[in-house]
Amino acid sequence: MQASRYAFCVLALLGVASIPASGTDWPRFRGPNGSGIADATGLPADLGDQRNILWKIFLPWGHSSPIISGNHIFLTAAEGGEETDAGREKVVDAGGQLVTFAIDRGNGEILWKKAAPRPRMERYEKTNSPASPSPVTDDENVYVFFGDFGLISYTVEGDERWRLPLGPFNNVNGHGSSPILVDDKVILVCDSDTAPYMLAVDKNTGKVIWKTDRPETTRSYVTPAVFQPKDGPLEVIVPSAYFLASYSADTGEKLWWVNGGGWQTKSTPIIHGDMIYSNSWEGGGQIPADGIPTFTEAIKKADKNGDGVMNEQELKIVEPKRKLYLIDLDHDKLVDQRDWEFHRIRRTSKSSLMAVRHGGRGNLTETDHLVWSLEKFLPNVPSPLIYDNVLYLIKDGGILSTLDPQTGEIFKQGRLRKALDKYYASPVGADDKVYMISHRAQGRRSVGDTDFPRLRGGGLRHARHRRESPVYSDSQYALLSGPTDKSIEARASS
């Protein structure tokens, strides 16, 4: 392992000195239904304090967030490999194992560690890792996903129950989507630049119940949320590149959608009453649609050899400033109609935070179900948070925005002092506080609605490069930091 790959990172539990087990506390990425909200009380005002440490252990690197079930903490990591350059700011984790850890919540003891098969080693973006998807649990079993293998289920005691190989995937940045549990199904979004899909797997057998192709999208890194309407089937809400959609949890049928958003979606949707909020950052330049030729027009102008596609030299005739690899989705070194149509959509796409009222079917883009949208001040990776009827957005540079979730009106906006950093971790609301952790682990908390003067900050000593979202449970607070070596601390509240 190269020494440059290591840094000291921290996961902390803050709470009572005696840590009780209490069922499923934080069962999936972003907690209950991805909300980022916990019922915890007695949490600290500042995150940088080093007092009251109960235990600390060290773990290998990875970007998955921990989950909590009873007396167990589960998380995944990559162990023993070596990052090698794969070109174009992509890397491959060569030779390492993909592992799942179970940790005793009370004393930090590693209860078990299991390695997954690794039939391939797909490349990923340097800020990602091969162990980014977070586990999910139903208290009795835990389910994990690795892009280099697929899905695996273990009992909470570490016995393997089943495995389902998936892939390979064509996702140049690696994976970021975590599995969720819906009734008796494990649901997973497998978006990529070719053949994207979503599937539901029987949580008891690992058999595929349904699989829904998603040809209208490309790569994304989202974890869904679940919406239960008053009437009708349970719905799985899935943000995507270029649209937000709902699917029947029972059948995988696409029920409704709203077009719009950026071309790389990373945030988890938020359900608040009958409203759904979806953030999609990274627009393509907002070029007018008529400013980019259709495929027919491009071929007529550029296809000099008459084969019906464009090679690298021909592409320069119609897109002299665009690299072939950015348009060629299937990596065959040619631009066909699918490649070009998604290129046009990408170039015209806009970052967007959409607020959608549930209740329709089919295409809701031009209906009053799209209540409001915002195209500025949006996060790249962090998910929105709605806490105490205030919508929080934290983006790179420490720019914090608070909004009225009903109207989209901005209450207040400003930069967090001493936290002008990149933000990958999503904010979490608990105990009348909102916690935000930056890339370099500059901890911040806000108390009370939009009152910025009551923000406090504190660096998490020895913690660097935080990308996982905080985890809260009962009167405890858990924080995981990566992407390199992780350490775990348990603390008592003061």
Which residues are covered by each model-predicted region?
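N-terminal secretory signal peptides that target proteins for export/translocation
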Residues: 1-6
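Bacterial N-terminal signal peptides
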Residues: 7-18
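Noncatalytic, solvent-exposed loop/strand surfaces
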Residues: 21-491
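Short, linear, compositionally biased motifs with a strong N-terminal bias
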Residues: 13, 491-493
